[in-house]
């Protein structure tokens, strides 16, 4: 076995030390946003297996923006959002003394954006140790709204986090006029564009897509954190049913 020496590695080399995941399927009884991030962050800190109290060294807390906190998004969840400074709320819940509070813009690229930004700041000696957290509690939040249950999830610790990332609107005025905002309305346009490009019939496109998603589901069936850890056949994907609706 090769003896690997790290003596020539700079002290400011970014290293991912620990991580954790959490899937909460308790529906209306699930975690709120802050509880969820706090729980998974505790597990990530423990995963670092540090010999001393790592919490004392975390000087930066970064959080990936939630869908429910997307600016200009006309939805009940946006109107009820009650966490104006989630990085500080999370820091307080973990008894951290982080002096840097970072919150990303909305986007599928935001987790990687945050990783890159934190790594660069560590490299440039701007920060020493960072905690990055993100997740969604929409299943619980929307479920409680549907059942008329209390949804006063909020914490206002004061201050304003630093915002990183581009905040460009994902749709223009014409697209908004036609309701083209949520993925369920936009993705079918992409699918039909691909079908046209490939000169396929609707049936041919469905069969190709079903084969792709069967492979995805096969991978998910082996992942304990998958929302649907079930291996579904192509036939299930080409046969619409009420159980296919996930929102």
Language-model region placement:
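Accessory "access/gating" subregions that flank catalytic or transport cores
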Residues: 229-239
């Amino acid at each position: 076995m090769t003896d690997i020496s790290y003596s020539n590695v700079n002290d400011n080399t970014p290293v991912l030390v620990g991580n954790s995941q959490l899937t909460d399927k308790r529906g209306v009884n699930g975690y709120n946003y802050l509880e969820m991030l706090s729980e998974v962050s505790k597990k990530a800190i423990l995963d670092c297996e540090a010999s001393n109290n790592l919490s004392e060294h975390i000087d930066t807390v970064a959080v990936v923006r939630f869908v429910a906190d997307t600016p200009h998004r006309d939805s009940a969840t946006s109107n009820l959002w009650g966490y104006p400074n989630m990085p500080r709320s999370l820091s307080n819940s973990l008894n951290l003394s982080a002096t840097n509070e970072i919150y990303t813009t909305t986007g599928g690229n935001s987790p990687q954006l945050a990783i890159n930004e934190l790594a660069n700041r560590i490299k440039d000696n701007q920060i020493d140790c960072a905690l990055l957290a993100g997740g969604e509690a929409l299943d619980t939040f929307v479920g409680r709204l549907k059942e008329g249950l209390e949804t006063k999830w909020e914490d206002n610790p004061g201050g304003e986090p630093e915002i990183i990332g581009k905040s460009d609107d994902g749709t223009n005025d014409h697209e908004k006029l036609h309701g083209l905002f949520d993925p369920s309305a936009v993705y079918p346009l992409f699918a039909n564009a691909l079908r046209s490009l490939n000169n396929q019939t609707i049936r041919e496109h469905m069969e190709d897509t079903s084969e792709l998603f069967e492979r995805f589901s096969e991978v998910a069936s082996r992942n304990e954190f998958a929302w649907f850890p079930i291996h579904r056949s192509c036939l299930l994907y080409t046969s619409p049913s009420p159980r296919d609706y996930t929102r």
